Amino acid sequence: MRKIPNHGTLRMTKVAYPLGLCVGLFIYVAYIKWHRASAAQAFFTIAGAASGARWTQQAFSSPGSAARGHEVFYGIMFDAGSTGTRIHVFQFARPPGETPTLTHETFKALKPGLSAYADDVEKSAQGIQELLNVAKQHIPYDFWKATPLVLKATAGLRLLPGEKAQKLLQKVKEVFKASPFLVGDDCVSIMNGTDEGVSAWITVNFLTGSLKTPGSSSVGMLDLGGGSTQITFLPRVEGTLQASPPGHLTALQMFNRTYKLYSYSYLGLGLMSARLAILGGVEGKPAENDKELVSPCLSPRFRGEWEHAEVTYRISGQKAVGLYELCASRVSEVLRNKVHRTEEAQHVDFYAFSYYYDLAASFGLIDAEKGGSLVVGDFEIAAKYVCRTLETQPPSSPFACMDLTYISLLLHEFGFPGDKVLKLARKIDNVETSWALGAIFHYIDSLKRQKVPAL
């Protein structure tokens, strides 16, 4: 119990003593009632939200945070990608009447990805358990039963046959159910591309503070992965909503507000899948009769092998005049009629991630550690330089000309002019700009809405 400070010695008469005792007792009772009420307010009940989940658990503020009036809660998100499985342990704090803030993140990754255990699902449990131990180490014991635990799988499991993928997910679910954390029936799933884009949009706008103030300007999100690419932003022009093709709009509810987002994932237009298409290959199939795939986008003297989606291809460059023009022509063929262009996008501030960042950093367009800003035209300038000097100054990667040309033309197809500024970042306020934060935050928010009408 909090100690009431003594501000001086009280000299009480026999008559005043009973009165003083009553006053003291009244203060004590009032304090106890206040303490219990504060503790009750610090609880937030998470009720089962989706897919028949059944639970009613309670989370509460740690003593230090409760003293500041902040509600503390945690969330655990597993990112099951194609090359590895990563755990993110997030700690949030919510001041009274305000939106939550991220106060701490713990991250750990293990290789290989879950898909590597497709033929022996039992072996997948060891890595999952190891990562769960990380969560136990960084989340106070009293919070375990109220901390949501979720796994979202991306490209790696999407490429597996359905039966194998489901067996892996079922094994993960068994391990999760045996853990001390809060687990619903929807605790493991394979993300679709749009969900990935929306979750990344939440992450960026949460970290930049755009979600905290109603009516504040939000930022758009561009993500270029290996198999797909996503674009997500919040339209302010009614014409954008009316002209959007089916499947390009999605509703997001956060903080008791509904956002109608323009969001679409282009499967097959991720950088690795685009490489294969530019080379003339077919996804998931070896070249006919082991034919060598030749492209003007590769270094003229290059000849070698390239593996994609567990298929190995023989590839080589070709000698020709005007390699950039030939490469750009081929890339344009691959992109033709594949991307929907919206006029409003050029007027929205965008962050770009993943391979956009990696390529820009590799060729000195931004600082490799800190990130930075560039204009879309910088990718075209870099592409022309690299492609036109392939023969005299071969780059370290034989795909440099192809990749830069592809990114340049992809951004053009999205409707961005050459002078459009993009912000490239791996971290915002020292937090990874991945979809994981947005996904767990949205999950927790949706659970809370089932019990509490306002955050």
From Swiss-Prot:
N-glycosylated. Keywords: ATP-binding, Calcium, Cell membrane, Disulfide bond, Glycoprotein, Golgi apparatus, Hydrolase, Magnesium, Membrane, Nucleotide-binding, Secreted, Signal-anchor, Transmembrane, Transmembrane helix. Strongly and equally activated by either Ca(2+) or Mg(2+). The chain crosses the membrane at residues 13-32. It holds the Pfam family GDA1_CD39. It is a single-pass type II membrane protein. Residues 1-12 are cytoplasmic. It is an enzyme of class 3 (hydrolase). It is found in: Golgi apparatus membrane; Secreted; Cell membrane. One of its GO terms (molecular function) is GDP phosphatase activity. Its EC number is 3.6.1.6. Disulfide bonds join C297-C327, C387-C401. GO terms for biological process: response to calcium ion; response to magnesium ion. Catalyzes the hydrolysis of nucleoside triphosphates and diphosphates in a calcium- or magnesium-dependent manner. Has a strong preference for nucleoside diphosphates, preferentially hydrolyzes GDP, IDP, and UDP, with slower hydrolysis of CDP, ITP, GTP, CTP, ADP, and UTP and virtually no hydrolysis of ATP. The membrane bound form might support glycosylation reactions in the Golgi apparatus and, when released from cells, might catalyze the hydrolysis of extracellular nucleotides. Belongs to the GDA1/CD39 NTPase family. This is Ectonucleoside triphosphate diphosphohydrolase 6. It comes from Mus musculus (Mouse). The lineage of its organism: Eukaryota, Metazoa, Chordata, Craniata, Vertebrata.
